[in-house]
């Protein structure tokens, strides 16, 4: 068993490979195998020919690493230096359409639910971090949120009693380290580049492309689209619930995300 792996991390490790990758499932590889080998050689690359964006490694309290880390050997020491952990062996591959702020919120929500509540830093700190992340994804982020997230993360890491609390901030810290520009877009520009955060998405109809087929108006569950047959239609942004039904159903590609 010790004949494979690295000097500091011998043997093999089982990982659960999932996400936006062609081949998913349980795999067992020698410690020190690179993420590139796992994602592309074993996983078959990214689905639908899209670009790789990140991989979340180590379970819910693991870290999100980028293309720059693809040749990093997956062993205990290397991942710790990169701000991640091997943890439970989860490997969630994400493509270019993934919002990293939303991902951080998703994992922080899981961590909040898993906290036993015994120590205040984990119980209250993670809840506060989740509140901030939720507010940011809903378009209500404000200056100082990034700094507060980092401050809370440091406090939780240093003060929590168990391993869950000490690693709980990893999803936020790693996405801040590698994708801070996305946080700033959400907070200051009120924009989600992937369109994942619906509260930050505004749908508009291009009058030069719209044929007035009325399909969007008929399918809109909120009755937010009006217009006459064979004439450009219009979306009432106050009524729009941002479900995306109009965009996905438009046969002419006339509906855009502003």
Residue ranges and their predicted role:
Residues 32, 116-122, 162, 192, ...:
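Short cysteine clusters
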Residues 43-44, 139, 214, 223, ...:
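Glycine-centered helix-boundary capping/hinge motifs
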Residues 107-110, 191-212, 223-242, 253-258:
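Ferredoxin-like iron-sulfur electron-transfer modules
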